[in-house]
Amino acid sequence: MKKIILLMMIFLAGCQNIDNEIDNELKVLDNSDSEELTFILELNTKNNSPEDVEEFTKYLSDFIVQREPSSVYGYYISEDGNKVTLIERYNNSQDGIQHGIDFINGPNFDKFFEIFEIEKFIILGYATDEFKQFTKENGFEIEYRESIGGYVRR
C-alpha cells in the first residue's frame, strides 16, 4: 500500500512539473507588440483546372518550405475550384521583404501569374514603412490591417 501511495505521489508531482514546463515555455504577447505579419491573398484560378492548380500549389509549397522563413504557408481552394486563398505568416517585415525579393526574382514568379490572378491582398499586423515601400515599388496593391486586440501565444 505504501508503494502505491508513493507511486501516486511521484506521478502527480511529475504531472505538475509537465504543466509548469508548458506554462514556462508558452508566452502570451499582445498582437500590438508582435512583429509577425500574416498575408491573406484571395486568388482567382483563371480557369485553370483544379488538378493543375493543386499540382502547382503542392510544388510551390515544397519549394518554399526549403527556402523561406515563413511559419505558416498554405493554399485553400473553393468547392468550385475557381478561388484559392493563400495564407502566409512571417516573423517580421524583413522576412516578408525577403520573401518578396525571393519570389520576384525566383523561378516561380511567371508561373504563379499563369495560374493565379490576385483579387485581394491583405496584410495583418504591423508592417514597417520599409515593407510598405517595397511592396508599393513592386506593384502590389495591399490592404493593411493593424491589430486592435488579441494575442500571439508562443
Residue positions per predicted region:
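A short gly/proline-enriched turn/hairpin at secondary-structure junctions
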Residues: 87-88, 111
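Sec-dependent N-terminal signal peptides
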Residues: 4-12
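Short S/T/G/P-rich N-terminal loop/turn motif that feeds into the first structured element of a domain
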Residues: 15-84, 91-101, 115-154
